[in-house]
Amino acid sequence: MDSISKMLRQHYSEKFSLHGPSSEGVDWGSDETKMLLRYDKMLGVVAHQEQSKPSLLDVGCGYGGLCSYAITKNIELDYTGIDVADNMIEWAAANVASGSFMRGDVLSYEFDREFDYVVCNGILTQKLETPGSEMDQFAARLIRRMFALCRIGIAFNIMTTKVNYYSNNLYYRNPSEMFSWCLSEVSTHIKLDHSYPLYEYTIYLYRDAV
């Protein structure tokens, strides 16, 4: 596990110990509606899915909130969650029966399967004390790894630079530059959603046209 993953593990473990299974427990503040909106954006990657119960890997799954939310929206998934935070994974495994959960770092974990979809909700919005250039490299590795694990597509969110205030602990990337990088380095089948009322955007990358 690299230094960034270790830093994120400590940060999110502490937040979950303080706040439990909630939006504050994953460091998204007290407004639960914002968390649900982020879930909707992640599930948007399966909007064009025709087969029943597609497989989905949730990178940085936390306490399995996305899995539980999908059930409330009548979206059937063969759901797998992976996270580096021990206390979150233990809670998810004990309380979210509809998902499968594993403790580990997606960058080094040896999976024995692929997934139709891979999503990452929140990891690439935090840099904590990591220098921006190192976080850029981490993001590139993570996005490539996610795409290598998917059969159909991936989704992830990042803080936008189109803001009038920056927090030192958050990770911001210019949406135009990130779009161009993904287009040239990952896939030409790409969508960027900058339309929703949070200071972030979601990118969707697919192997084929949708």
Protein language model annotation of sequence segments:
Residues M1-S23:
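N-terminal, positively charged/glycine-rich alpha-helical extensions of SAM-dependent methyltransferases
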Residues Y166-V210:
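Class I S-adenosyl-L-methionine
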Residues S108-R113:
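Short conserved loop adjoining the S-adenosyl-L-methionine
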Residues L57, G65-M102:
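Class I SAM-dependent methyltransferase SAM/SAH-binding core
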Residues Y117-S133:
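A short SAM/SAH-binding and catalytic strip from SAM-dependent methyltransferases
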Residues G62:
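Conserved glycine-rich SAM-binding loop
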Residues C150-I158:
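Conserved beta-strand signature within the Rossmann-like core of class I S-adenosyl-L-methionine
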Residues T33-S52:
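Conserved alpha-helix/loop element of class I SAM-dependent methyltransferases that forms part
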